[in-house]
Each structure stands twice: as C-alpha cells, then as structure tokens.
Amino acid sequence: MDRPVIVALDLDNEEQLNKILSKLGDPHDVFVKVGMELFYNAGIDVIKKLTQQGYKIFLDLKMHDIPNTVYNGAKALAKLGITFTTVHALGGSQMIKSAKDGLIAGTPAGHSVPKLLAVTELTSISDDVLRNEQNCRLPMAEQVLSLAKMAKHSGADGVICSPLEVKKLHENIGDDFLYVTPGIRPAGNAKDDQSRVATPKMAKEWGSSAIVVGRPITLASDPKAAYEAIKKEFN
C-alpha cells in the first residue's frame, strides 16, 4: 500500500482552500493537513466540510496543556472524523495518555479512533536553538529518540519528526509505530523556515511512514502535477 503524502493546507481562508483543492483532484485520493492557521480562521465547519467531501484529514493543532484539558479537547476532536491529530511530546507522559483516552472516549461507535501523533522537536528547531534556548544538552537525535520512546510508552500511535531522525527511531523503537515527517523539500526547492529537511526520496529510504508537504505543492504552478510527482518519488 502506498504511504501517504499529506498536503499541508497552510492557508488562512476558505477561498484559498477551495482554489487549491479544486486543483488536486478526487477528494478520496487526497490526504490533507489542517493546522492552526486555517482552523483558527475558518473554524470547525471547515473540517466537517472536508470530511463530507471525502478528504482524509490530519488535524494538526499540537495540543499542549494540562492532562484534563487535553483529554476534553481530544474527546471533542474525535467526533470530527479525522484520521490524525497531534500533541506536543514535551507535555509529558500523562498528557499524552489523557489525549489518547480522550480520542477513544470521543470516537463515535463504528468509527476508527484517530491516530495520536506526538510532536518531538519542530523541524524549524536547530541544534543551536535546542542547546542555547531549550537548554537541552542532548544532541538533537538523542532528544528526539527520548521523546519518541516516552510517547510510545504513553500510548501515542506515532511521532512527528524530521526525516533525518527516522532511521535511528526505526532501529531503536521498531516498525510498529508511525513516523510522520514534515520538512520535505523536493530537490531544488527553498528550505523556507525549515532547518532539518530532506527530499521525498530520502524520506522513503530512511523509512518515513508518511510525509507532509506544503508550499512545494500549494505554491506550484500546477499543484496536482507537483503532488503526483512527490507521491511517485516517495512511493
């Protein structure tokens, strides 16, 4: 089975959203990521519309709060028919457990429980920021591994991490875990605000379960062609 290429819809209004989606083809063949920018501007109705149209949705809100609040937030999100959602691993094991419990409690009967992905270190975080601003003395790869192990032990279904860390995670955690990787840039594309990036081919070779790609698709002159090319390279 093909591993998904998830289109990051980092847009701020439904007009932009509809314009991009109209160029990507059959909704049943498209997996999209809705993050804070679109969700906070367009609201919960945009998720309902997308699911009704047949899109698979990764709702990326990166919950990070006390366990009870995250439980109730996850419980509400589970009612929306989404496929993936996220928490920050730095919120700790009890918060992750509460998020998973909330997703289970909120999922309607007969529906699949959304997969819970824990964000390790954002792909915009460099080694210098990790060391000098987060005051973490571990190398980036070791920090990500530590957070990923804790997330799996706490009930997460996978992690969000840079493709640069995936091979090490496979070796130390195993293959029964999702490794979803943003920071994907086809050869020749600008890094933009990402620090730890890789091409779709590299992500494939290192073992990413799914990749998240935004601007190289949404800003392309032909978004569908760009999407199909990236899917071909990744699979």
Curated annotation (Swiss-Prot):
Catalysed reactions listed for this entry: orotidine 5'-phosphate + H(+) = UMP + CO2
Pathway it works in: Pyrimidine metabolism; UMP biosynthesis via de novo pathway; UMP from orotate: step 2/2
Residues where substrate binds: 10, 33, 60-69, 123, 185, 194, 214-215
Domain of life of the native organism: Bacteria
Gene3D superfamilies documented for this protein: Aldolase class I (3.20.20.70)
Key words of the record: Decarboxylase, Lyase, Pyrimidine biosynthesis
Gene Ontology terms, MF aspect: orotidine-5'-phosphate decarboxylase activity
GO cellular component: cytosol
EC number annotated for this UniProt entry: 4.1.1.23
CDD domains xref list: OMP_decarboxylase_like (cd04725)
Name of a matching Pfam family: OMPdecase
GO aspect biological process, one term: 'de novo' pyrimidine nucleobase biosynthetic process
Active-site residue numbers: 62
Homology family: Belongs to the OMP decarboxylase family. Type 1 subfamily.
Known role: Catalyzes the decarboxylation of orotidine 5'-monophosphate (OMP) to uridine 5'-monophosphate (UMP).
Subunit structure: Homodimer.
Protein name: Orotidine 5'-phosphate decarboxylase
Gene that specifies this protein: pyrF
